[in-house]
Amino acid sequence: MTAASPAKGLIALLRLPYWLMTGGLSVLTAFAITKTMIAPQTILLIFFSMAFITSAGFAINDYFDRESDAVIKPKRPIPAGTLSLKQVVAVSGVLFALGLVMAALINWFSFAIIAVDSLLLLVYSYMVKRKSGFAANILVGILTGTAFMYGQATITSPATVNLVSLSLYPIAFGTIGGNVLRDILSVDGDSKVGYPTLPQKIGRVSAAKVGALFFMLTGLLAPLPYFIGNFTIYYLPLILLWSVLLIYASIRLVTSASTVQNVRKYERIVTMSMILLPLALIAEAVLGGLL
């Protein structure tokens, strides 16, 4: 083991790209809702509180997945030997604590959301993932949706959540669909370690249709914040383009052969098109305040 191995293991454990998906999404939601400047310290607290909780969840999940990862994901920090079990648990505990403290510094409702997220992440890692793969997919979608609620809770006074962030929540359905497709692509490896994923229970063809349903729902409901009057017209162009791509992918998943190649193709389309969501929120935050 090289001296750099623990550092590399820590970086791998944190899953840094997901910080943009959680902390970044919360910050963009806050800006899109308020359409004004937010204090720099509040921005940092929003971003890192959600990001740290996300990494804490990944770390504790790696701890509980250590035996299966040794078989299907041997490069993960624990099976690769770059981090010990005690180190992984310590990192997870520290990150959970930091995330909760930062949320508490914003307001009580932000703390409550982060606390519930933390509990759900522990339940997911310890129990749900091994009992029901599809229930795990649903839970991940629920957790993703809380990023929108968190974004609003951090900038409203008194702290609250209403139709503004709740109208964004259905966007999280796309996360569920994406995880179902990824389960299809990893069905051989999951079967080796006994993960009861949806494709193993109902087959790849039916699972692809389930994933397509969630993409269709996301595509149809993504423009909702505009149509109920919460967001301005500037949110609409990019989000409608994303909706079209999601609906196209969902239709093709149902009408084309559910081969691994096709599933991978449409999963990539959906994944790459997700950049349109933060861009739409940026457009709303920057241009929406002009109306």
Q: At which residue positions do the language-model features occur?
A:
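Membrane-interface helix-boundary motifs at transmembrane edges
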Residues: 37, 129-132, 157-159, 186, ...
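Extended hydrophobic alpha-helices typical of membrane-associated regions
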Residues: 2-8, 224-291
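Select subsegments of transmembrane alpha-helices in polytopic membrane proteins
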Residues: 12-21, 84-93, 135-140, 205-215, ...
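Multi-pass membrane catalytic core of lipid/isoprenoid biosynthesis enzymes
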Residues: 48, 66-115, 195-231
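Intramembrane alpha-helical segments
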Residues: 2-12, 78-159, 251
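Hydrophobic core of alpha-helical transmembrane segments in multi-pass integral membrane proteins
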Residues: 25-30, 93-102, 117-122, 216-224, ...
